Amino acid sequence: MPRQRAPKEEEAELLTKQERSTRSSEDASDASVSSISTTSLVLEHINNPAINGTSRSRRGEKYTDEDDEAQEAFDVEDGRYKAPVAVDKKTRRWLWIVGIACVTGWALALVFFLMSGSYKHVSTRPHDPLASSTKGSGKKITMDDVFGGSFYAQQQSVKWIAGPNGEDGLLLEKNTGNAGYLVVEDIRNKGDGDSSAKKTKLMQKSSFDVDGKLVRPNEVWPSKDFKKVLVQSDFEKNWRHSGTGKYWIFDVATQTGEPLDPENQDGRVQLASLSPQSDAVVFTRDNNMYLRKLDSKEVIQITRDGGSELFYGIPDWVYEEEVFQGNSATWWSEDGKYIAFLRTDESTVPTYPVQYFVSRPSGNKPKAGEENYPEVRNIKYPKAGAPNPIVALQFYDVEKAEVFSVEIEDDFRDNNRLITEIVWAGKTKQVLVRETNRESDILKVVLMDVEKRTGKTVRTENVAELDGGWFEVSQKTTFVPADPDNGRKDDGYIDTIIHEGYDHIGYFTPLDNDKPVLLSQGEWEVVDAPSRVDLKNNMVYYVSTEKSSMERHAYSVFLNGTGTSEVVENSGSGYYEASFSAGGSYALITYQGPGIPWQKIISTPSNKDKFEKVLEENKHLDRFVREREMPILNYQTIDVDGFKLNVLERRPPHFNEKKKYPVLFYQYSGPNSQEVNKKFHVDFQAYVAANLGYIVVTVDGRGTGFLGRKLRCITRGNLGYYEAHDQIAAAKIWASKKYVDADRLAIWGWSFGGFNTLKTLEQDGGQTFKYGMAVAPVTDWRYYDSIYTERFMHMPQNNAAGYDNSTITDVASLAKNTRFLIMHGVADDNVHMQNTLTLLDRLDLAGVENYDVHVFPDSDHSIYFHNANRIVYDKLRWWLINAFNGEWAKIKTAEPKSQVDARLERR
């Protein structure tokens, strides 16, 4: 129903309806490119009110009634109906001069117009992600485009594999059509017409029969000699990285399969792993470990006391989520004679119940009479300060069939130890163990000799004393074997180290040396390094931020720290990922942006045989992007309290500095994270800018990654303070810009970003931001898991004040914001619903009501169950539009509409 419009709504309309009308006019005129001459096209554009500025609703002005303009044009007083009057010579001369000037000006405008190419449809132009303005016109980005995968770049999944005799440059490929289901191909033959004869076929078909049962593989792992394939089928998900399945041994020569455990072929296996010698498989079932030697049908049980609270060879929930980001805690020695594994005892870990009101993830039918009760899954979840699982490293001697442990004199106590990485030192029967204390600020590297069953700490670092920070979990330590003939006298390893406040890589040799050879240094950082070590050429490959913290480039360096060079020559500005072949002679280079992504395989600097093969160019995506009006990306840095922070500003197409735009801040802000980078990425933020016409700003504030430890570690012990402060400081900078409507600023985020959204609103108290949207937020760090939280906050017992400061408690400050939104998955096993519910209770107690809540039954942290993910973004969109249209401001002063007598209405 029509109602009185506020001035702010009219300004919002100028950014929505009016602009859509203007752009539709541009689209209509541009659509005629192929059917009319250039001259008529130019005239059409010049006469188009949307282009020449004579639109009745002028940008930057309030709405103008059309009847008023018509009256002004045809006013009786303008002389329209007066008799013609003769023009004298002087006047005619001036008219000629003015006419000639107009024609000349028109001609110059025509030349400029043609040279600028403004008449062209946007699809005729190459995509320029760093363009400062939009030329031409195109289709608007839609939500279906974003969430339907239209902007996804095709990428070929390349899995490098070493040949049985150490051959390099081999690829493992699945679903290759006529060539077979699982094949090994030399990269030099890839794409050379009918090269099937040059491929090694491991599995011809995509299924096989075992005792009348059809087996369809989910995952496959070839043995190192290419004679067997370990096959997983019938996978059922457990947590984020884990699940169970049925496992099979497939014989390549006969193309037949058999059960991993012939006596229990329907048993659900949690993890299975082939030995490096291709002669055995170790696996975990029902939390106990087993060994199957492939020359026998017999299965040997390694452990027997595993159960609901004791795991062997696999991680529990918190280790899976926060340490390994995977489902394996089992490691074969290179000679296949020993197996290292974790024994995880979570009997003292408290339980958290997760409720499912719609589904039954267990697959079990409820008991009679309990059909109407929710299914409850109890998770052993250690919250900050609560007892952690007790983790111990154990070994299994395959020949002796014996389980044993190696004691270390100066080891951490059981309740103060995190085991984060295990690396076998080749065939030396030694193993490197990376451990930290519970708060992750003291590191120990332990060297164990499993044959002698002795061990010692070879390296200790206390980063709390160094810079007050923490150690990140890493599984990139790489063993480098001795090779005296090739200049490597002793065994060693490469690890990430801290050098002058930045993450770099160092080479430790011999194994017990605690002083590394520096392989990289500078005011930039390595990323998940090293990527590969070429032992033949003593060369190390790594990816770093040397050119820009917003970019990634691949480099090589010799083991003595000299000869650094870029893998991709003249790569320019960009975000590159690199995956290196087993021997380091080839690399899959994936260009992620800012332009259209592409992939190619190249020879590396250590390979004298130059090679290059393009795998993917994403031409379809390039065409699709050209036809759309993309947001204008403006990368920059801002100074906040002496720190340089990276910023990405997404501007609407056809951005006009004379207009006033609302601004949405999107951030994650978590420790060591990064959102501002130069990847090609079209997401909800791009949609908001390109379709809704709002500016979207992302700021990586203090605490985020790849800008050095000084900026990163300042947040320790007080999460949320600097993160929120920096968002507010950035918002004030944008609020002062002439093209920003300072009364329409909002912020949103998910997970840690949801926490920081609420923390920002709490700290700001409505002075800068008026609106916020928080999805799955932490509201009290005492509720989050111990390993993650204590790394950045210490234990609550050691930092009670810090936890109090980080908790969202100042609800009176939240009440000063115009309105905020909270959404959460009820079955979130990561950030528990408890976080949102306890905040709602605080709001209720204080009588705060300026917020909306949406919960999603049975959804976990990703919020996907029953169409929930699309609803999240639809809700964000709808809620944001209402915020910037001023609807939420009206709710504060809402009054009932006066009732009209029905008898008067009938009259």
From Swiss-Prot:
GO terms for molecular function: aminopeptidase activity; dipeptidyl-peptidase activity; serine-type peptidase activity. It is an enzyme of class 3 (hydrolase). SUPFAM superfamilies: alpha/beta-Hydrolases, DPP6 N-terminal domain-like. GO terms for biological process: proteolysis. One of its GO terms (cellular component) is fungal-type vacuole membrane. Residues 1-26 have a biased composition (Basic and acidic residues). Residues 1-70 are annotated as: Disordered. Its EC number is 3.4.14.5. Glycans are attached at N560, N805. InterPro entries: AB_hydrolase_fold (IPR029058), Peptidase_S9_cat (IPR001375), Peptidase_S9B_N (IPR002469), Serine_Prot_S9B/DPPIV (IPR050278). Keywords: Aminopeptidase, Glycoprotein, Hydrolase, Membrane, Protease, Serine protease, Signal-anchor, Transmembrane, Transmembrane helix, Vacuole. The chain crosses the membrane at residues 94-114. This is Probable dipeptidyl-aminopeptidase B. The gene is dapB.
